[in-house]
Amino acid sequence: MSRRAFSVAVFARNGGAVLLVHHRRLGTWLPVGGELEADETPLEAARRELLEETGLSGRFPAGLGVDGTPAGLIGYEEHLAGSKGLHMNFAFVADVPSRELAHCDEWSEARWVTGPEGLDCPENVRQLLVLALAAPSSSG
């Protein structure tokens, strides 16, 4: 398989709740995120996507993994995605200072949730949501 697509998902966290948005094109609840740009690291893409889709800057907690692991990284997943080939997604958690969101055309509704119960979203989003809620907070 020669084609690959790289993306990030950012679970923005504030006051014990995590932000999910209802994605217009995909029609389901997801964290904010998107594809990496040409010369971006996954963490740089996560910071950019969070700001673009919410207007918020986040603090990505350090020390969640092995030395060399990007701050805030809580998971990695891959799957085949049609013409894109292998889709590789890096999932992050970021502590944000507010629940006030800038409007974004990519989503139609936003919710701050405290758990996966009752959510109409993919199973991997439920699993990562639990990890995001349990991850240590950033230290400033």
PLM regions with names:
Residues 90-93, 100-134:
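NUDIX/MutT-family hydrolases
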Residues 1-18, 35-38:
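Conserved N-terminal beta-strand and adjoining loop/helix that marks the start
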Residues 137-140:
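Actinobacteria-biased recognition of intrinsically disordered, low-complexity terminal regions
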Residues 24-26, 68, 108-111:
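Short, solvent-exposed aromatic-acidic interface loops
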Residues 5, 13, 31, 83-89:
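Short connector loops at helix/strand junctions that flank enzyme active sites
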Residues 55-99:
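Active-site segment of metal-dependent pyrophosphate-handling enzymes
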